[in-house]
Amino acid sequence: MLTDIEISRQTKHRPITQIAEKFGITSSELVPFGDAKAKVKLSILKRVDDNLEGKLVIVTAVTPTPFGEGKTVTSIGLTQGLNALGKKACACIRQPSMGPVFGIKGGAAGGGYSQVVPMEELNLHLTGDIHAVSSAHNLAAAAIDARLFHESRMTADEYREQSGQAPLNIDPEKILWRRVVDHNERSLRNITVGLGANNGPIHDSGFDITAASELMAILALSLDLKDMRRRIGKLVLALDSLGQPITAETLGVAGAMTVIMSDAIEPTLMQTLTGDPCLIHAGPFANIAHGNSSIIADRIALKLADIVVTEGGFGSDMGFEKFCNIKTRVSGKTPDAAVVVVTLKALKANSGIDSQNDINRPDMARLQVGFANLKWHIDNVSQYGAPVVVAINRFPTDTFEELTWLKAKVLETAAFGCEICEGFSQGAKGAEALARVVVSATEQKSDFKFLYQLDESIESKLLTIAEAGYGAAGIKLSPDAKIQLQEINSMGLDKLAVCVAKTPLSISHEPKVKGVPTDFELPITQLKINAGAGFITALVGKVMTMPGLGIKPGYLNVDINEDDEIVGLA
């Protein structure tokens, strides 16, 4: 079979203006970036405000494995299948980070005959939104250190006289705002800044990947430009010598940060291989952030489409939980149906197999053991009240016996339906059966409910997520987390939502514990204030906000061929 990039190149793409026109976006609402992609102006929201809203389908998955479950493939395939059935459907997905693109995961455009094209443009830069987030984020870091430097070299009266501003008295040991870059770079996780004459004061800092920036979460959760400006102003960058928060508004940098991101707030329109619309916007990771594409993209799509397909990162314990408890609270739009993606490989891997050869070999015994993980995710999604459809993403090595057994087994659970999806190999045709079941699911009553209420304490919300969202026996706060909890409570931020940052490779905090872990205590190591985004991030176990490159990074395969074409992107 051809590679993803070869399939993308061999398919004739329609001009993005035609995709927009067919979807209902006028030329005055479009800012093209070449023929393949275009920004969509937010002015469209006013024009379509009276339109009826379409149905919203959220795609999630079982616990991720190194073999890939195909969540984006399924999301794009489902969108293609829905359109093939005569529904007006649109996909809304996140913008890929170049960290994973050049790391081990690869791109995030889907794959095979269910992908967003041109895939290389999606996976590399797109329309520059991630760079805008990086620049705005790092401006705040520079502003903090500049203020710290100038205040440290003169008296309070001298500073007030020369700057016209009151000193902020930033505590160098309480600077909460780190720097970001859109690459996997473990050596930058912890650094010391201010070294050398006239560069201080010296203090510890570090880099996170841009997808972990609170600004990325703000971009995804903002309702419009004014809302983004308001949220950026609430960013807590540091504490002063009395332990009081210093915000981006206080520092006077919020306006400039907003201006840098003013174009980034517009989603980007692209297309699938079959010419179906896809809105790409924002890129927060689901393990270290809230892991969903933007509310703005959803709002536009829902006013133009019958059905909108979006996805939450990683398994249902990660992106789906945050979709429900964070994104939905802000958007006010609850899901009409949820799709859980599974593969035979994933079930075998969650039974304890990690060999590629063993994974591809038929093994009913291993499937039965691994099925517990799928059932856990079905039950986890079901507790939120939306109808659940299981999509079996088929691989060439899957046997008829295994697939038949799995489909029958799923129908014994709380799932509304189950269907095999072959979007990767067949595109729209291979996803039509799944699309029919999903349409039926969206016509059922959805009795959505949150996992917790915002007026609960931070500890109560964490305990609920741990017990009901992961199956944990309880939580344990580290000494640092207990101090941070006191600070959060003293600032009156205890009514914010909670975003748990943990490994995606297990339902628990231990990446090597597969299947359905039980009788474990969730260790909360740190609590981070994300007042602009509207949540408190709880770091669990050994989770890192800056990934590192592996021994065989993806960049080794990427190059330019003799025809000046990009090769090696996966």
Curated annotation (Swiss-Prot):
Pfam families in alphabetical order: FTHFS (PF01268)
A molecular function GO annotation: ATP binding
Keyword presence, ATP-binding: yes
Origin superkingdom: Bacteria
Catalytic class of the enzyme: ligase
Binding, ATP: 65-72
Keywords: ATP-binding, Ligase, Nucleotide-binding, One-carbon metabolism
This enzyme's EC code(s): 6.3.4.3
Gene3D superfamilies: Domain 2, N(10)-formyltetrahydrofolate synthetase (3.30.1510.10), Formyltetrahydrofolate synthetase, domain 3 (3.10.410.10), P-loop containing nucleotide triphosphate hydrolases (3.40.50.300)
Gene Ontology terms: biological process: tetrahydrofolate interconversion
Pathway: One-carbon metabolism; tetrahydrofolate interconversion
Reactions catalysed: (6S)-5,6,7,8-tetrahydrofolate + formate + ATP = (6R)-10-formyltetrahydrofolate + ADP + phosphate
Family label: Belongs to the formate--tetrahydrofolate ligase family.
HAMAP family in alphabetical order: FTHFS
Annotated protein name in UniProt: Formate--tetrahydrofolate ligase
Organism: Shewanella sediminis (strain HAW-EB3)
Gene designation: fhs
